[in-house]
Regions:
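Short, polar/acidic, helix-capping and beta-turn segments at strand->helix junctions
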Residues: 1-99
Length: 99
């Protein structure tokens, strides 16, 4: 299952959530988890994530959010600094999951 990049958007309104970079990364992970649950998958099934970060090269906040949410062993992770993300989001996370 390929989950396309999830921005830190409220699933009800589509508006970006406010907060720290870690809080925004957590919302991205909430959105990834919601997509996975539609196919009866969980974050435990994720084998690879790609983190897109715009406007900063401080990946530590995103790493902290991922460490809190993913079980061990953590999935493989690529971190990519980009010029921009849709709606001006500072972070987006995509995932690959399988059973």
């Amino acid at each position: 299952m390929f989950v396309s990049a999830q921005r830190p958007a409220d699933p009800k309104t589509g508006a970006l959530v406010k907060g720290s970079l870690k809080e925004m990364a957590t919302q991205c992970l909430d959105n990834v988890e919601a997509v996975l649950s539609e196919l009866d998958l969980t974050l435990s099934d994720v084998t690879k994530v790609t983190v897109l970060l715009a406007g900063t090269d401080d990946f530590s906040a995103v790493d902290a959010a991922c460490e809190e949410r993913f079980p061990r062993p953590m999935p493989a992770c690529s971190r990519v600094q980009v010029v921009s993300i849709a709606q001006g989001a500072p972070v987006a996370i995509e995932a690959i999951a399988c059973r």
